[in-house]
Amino acid sequence: MKVYCLLLVLLVGLVSQAHGQLDKKCQMVCTMDYRPVCGSDGRTYPNKCTLTSTACMSQRSITVFHDGEC
């Protein structure tokens, strides 16, 4: 039982560390300019920077499908 608890604690620590590294990698300062773009996921983003940031944080490949709202 103690071994399982120790493994669980280690696993939680590793996941937390990986998430922290992802946050640092994906940190972007996006302006509040509203220049909507339609993402390849069918969602409208306020601007290209927001789309890029969302793609990085979600670890998905989202590209600009076209300018303007979807």
From Swiss-Prot:
Keyword tags: Disulfide bond, Ion channel impairing toxin, Neurotoxin, Protease inhibitor, Secreted, Serine protease inhibitor, Signal, Toxin
One of the record's GO molecular function terms: serine-type endopeptidase inhibitor activity
Signal sequence segment: 1-20
Cellular location(s): Secreted
GO terms for cellular component: extracellular region
SUPFAM superfamilies hit by this protein: Kazal-type serine protease inhibitors
Keyword Signal: yes
One GO term (biological process): cell differentiation
Similarity comment text for this entry: Belongs to the conopeptide P-like superfamily.
Domain notes: The cysteine framework is IX (C-C-C-C-C-C).
Entry protein name: Turripeptide Gsg9.2
Taxonomic path: Eukaryota, Metazoa, Spiralia, Lophotrochozoa, Mollusca
